[in-house]
C-alpha cells in the first residue's frame, strides 16, 4: 500500500495524540506515595521556631513502609523556589531513580514534580532525604528537615516485639566555627529527636515486660550522636538496615551521620526514664 504525505501526517498526528493521552493517563494515575517539598516553620520547643524545608509539612517526613519486592510509585512535588532532588538511601535501584546527581538522576525544577518508580529492596531500615548540594548555605541540603524513614518489610518471619518505634536525630541552625584546623567544622544551636528538643516531646508509653524495637536514624548533616536509655541496656539487632551476625547488649550506641541502628529493649524497670 502506498502512503501519501497527507496519510502520513494524519497517522503521525494520531500517534502523537496517543502518546499525549498515555502521558495524561499516567499523570492522572495516583501514585502510592506523594511527597511535597515546601518551606516549614517548625516549633521544636515553646518559643523556639526553626525555618526550614521539609516533606508534607512535618519533620521527619512520612514513614514509608512497603513490602520487599513490591513495585512502588512516588510522586515528589517541589514547592520551593530552588531545584531539589530526593535520594533513596540504601536501596538497590537503577541510577536514574536513585536520586543522586553523580549517578545521573535529574533535579526536580522549582515548582516542578517527578514520579519515581522502582521496586524497593533489600529489606530493612532505609531512609530518604534531599541530595541537593548545600555548599556554603547552611540552610539548604542536609541541614534542612528533608528526611524520612523508609522501612522495607522482609518476606522472612518478622522479629518478635510488642512495640515498634521510629526515631530520627537532627541538628539545627548550623554555623561555621572554631579556628585553625577546626575552622570548617559545623556547630549547631539545637538538636531534636523527631521534631522536638529533649524534654519537650511526647513520652513513649510502655508496659512492664514489653519488648520494644527502636529504629533510630541520625539524620544530622555532620554531627555524631551517642544514644542511651537510662536504667536499661539495649540489644543491637541491626545496623544500617541489615541484621547483625551476632546481637550484642550494650549500655549506649554511637551514630555517625546517616547511620541507622535497630535496638531491642526489654522494659523491665518501671518508672520514667530519659532516652
Regions found by a protein language model. Give the residues of each.
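Histidine- and aromatic-enriched segments that form or immediately flank copper-ligand environments
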Residues: 29-157, 222-254, 272-275
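A structural feature that tracks compact, well-ordered secondary-structure segments
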Residues: 215-217, 225-230, 264-266
Amino acid at each position: 500500500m502506498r502512503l501519501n504525505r497527507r496519510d502520513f501526517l494524519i497517522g503521525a498526528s494520531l500517534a502523537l495524540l496517543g502518546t499525549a493521552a498515555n502521558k495524561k493517563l499516567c499523570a492522572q494515575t495516583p501514585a502510592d506515595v506523594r511527597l511535597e517539598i515546601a518551606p516549614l516553620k517548625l516549633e521544636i520547643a515553646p518559643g523556639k521556631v526553626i525555618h526550614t524545608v521539609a516533606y508534607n509539612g512535618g519533620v521527619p517526613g512520612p514513614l514509608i513502609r512497603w513490602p520487599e519486592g513490591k513495585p512502588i510509585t512516588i510522586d515528589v512535588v517541589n514547592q520551593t523556589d530552588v531545584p531539589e532532588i530526593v535520594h533513596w538511601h540504601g536501596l538497590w535501584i537503577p541510577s536514574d531513580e536513585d536520586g543522586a546527581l553523580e549517578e545521573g538522576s535529574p533535579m526536580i525544577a522549582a515548582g516542578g514534580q517527578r514520579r519515581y518508580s522502582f521496586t524497593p529492596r533489600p529489606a530493612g531500615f532505609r531512609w530518604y532525604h534531599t541530595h541537593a548540594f548545600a555548599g556554603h548555605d547552611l540552610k539548604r541540603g542536609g541541614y534542612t528537615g528533608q528526611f524520612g524513614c523508609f522501612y522495607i518489610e522482609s518476606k522472612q518471619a518478622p522479629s518478635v516485639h510488642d512495640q515498634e518505634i521510629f526515631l530520627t536525630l537532627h541538628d539545627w541552625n548550623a554555623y561555621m566555627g572554631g579556628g585553625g584546623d577546626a575552622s570548617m567544622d559545623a556547630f549547631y544551636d539545637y538538636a531534636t529527636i523527631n521534631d522536638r528538643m529533649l524534654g519537650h516531646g511526647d513520652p513513649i508509653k510502655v508496659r512492664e515486660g514489653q519488648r520494644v524495637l527502636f529504629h533510630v536514624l541520625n539524620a544530622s548533616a555532620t554531627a555524631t550522636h551517642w544514644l542511651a536509655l537510662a536504667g536499661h541496656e539495649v540489644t543491637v539487632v541491626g545496623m544500617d538496615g541489615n541484621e547483625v551476625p551476632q546481637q550484642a547488649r550494650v549500655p549506649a550506641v554511637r551514630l555517625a551521620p546517616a547511620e541507622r541502628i535497630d535496638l531491642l529493649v526489654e522494659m523491665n524497670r518501671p518508672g520514667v526514664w530519659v532516652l
